[in-house]
């Protein structure tokens, strides 16, 4: 049994490593990657891509430690960091070889990973109570409004301030749902203490951690700085926000999953 578990884990790591190597080679094939020592934005892309890889392996391997009802949540956490890691390989290539902001790759990443993060709220509540599907769809609607608004502004399809306002409205809608809406009420009424604690921490990440993204948008597009300074500020702020929000979300899910699993064994 032990050898089977070890073999399974090694297979996961091996498969992930092979896929990662292929992705890295494909990203590097589009240009010669030369990372300069004073390119702090490029350095942040490399550091964060590696942190996301490590997080992915961790979340997938830790699935064996938790009960069945938490495995899906940990799998989603691993998928979030996996998808982000793959996109970061391409984004860092775009930045290092061209010096331009990888807007399209970043928003493709967000259009996949941010809805997955919102699904985590639904999954963590579904593990302990019956949750109406309306909660899921309201979180998805808020997420799409937020992301589409941001993209239309950054891609030049809409006035920057108008797009900023639309994105902020989507974010506010999400905050309402997790602080005062049905998701918040289910958490307060039916969740055990450990789940309530995790839910509360997750929603403060969405409040404080996600507030970093509007700062990146503001310093990247709305301050009137030089194109170089604006691009540097935008990408460093976005990169740090991605690291904090995606990895921290997964670690919170992992902590409550392990805690609830161990409590059930006693």
Residue ranges of each PLM-predicted region?
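N-terminal secretory/membrane targeting signals
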Residues: 1-29
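Polytopic alpha-helical membrane-helix bundles and their juxtamembrane interface segments
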Residues: 23-106, 119-266
């Amino acid at each position: 049994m032990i050898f089977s578990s070890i073999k399974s884990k090694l297979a996961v790591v091996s498969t992930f490593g092979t896929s990662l190597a292929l992705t890295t080679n494909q990203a590097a094939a589009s240009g010669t990657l030369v990372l300069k020592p004073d390119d702090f934005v490029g350095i942040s892309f490399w550091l964060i891509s590696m942190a996301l890889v490590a997080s992915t392996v961790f979340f997938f391997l830790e699935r064996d430690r938790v009960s069945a009802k938490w495995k899906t949540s940990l799998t989603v956490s691993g998928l979030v960091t996996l998808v982000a890691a793959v996109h970061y390989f391409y984004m860092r290539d775009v930045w290092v070889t061209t010096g331009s902001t990888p807007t399209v790759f970043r928003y493709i990443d967000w259009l996949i990973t941010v809805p997955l993060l919102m699904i985590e709220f639904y999954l963590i509540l579904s593990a302990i109570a019956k949750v109406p599907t309306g909660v899921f769809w309201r979180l998805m609607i808020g997420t799409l409004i937020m992301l589409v608004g941001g993209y239309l502004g950054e891609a030049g399809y809409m006035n920057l301030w108008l797009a900023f306002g639309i994105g902020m409205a989507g974010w506010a809608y999400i905050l309402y749902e997790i602080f005062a809406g049905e998701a918040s009420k289910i958490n307060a009424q039916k969740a055990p203490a450990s789940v309530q604690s995790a839910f509360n921490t997750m929603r403060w990440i969405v409040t404080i951690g996600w507030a970093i993204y509007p700062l990146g948008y503001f310093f990247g597009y709305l301050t009137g700085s030089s194109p170089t300074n604006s691009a540097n500020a935008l990408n460093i702020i976005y990169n740090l926000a991605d690291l904090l929000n995606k990895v921290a979300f997964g670690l919170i899910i992992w902590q409550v999953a392990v805690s609830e699993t161990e409590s059930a064994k006693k």
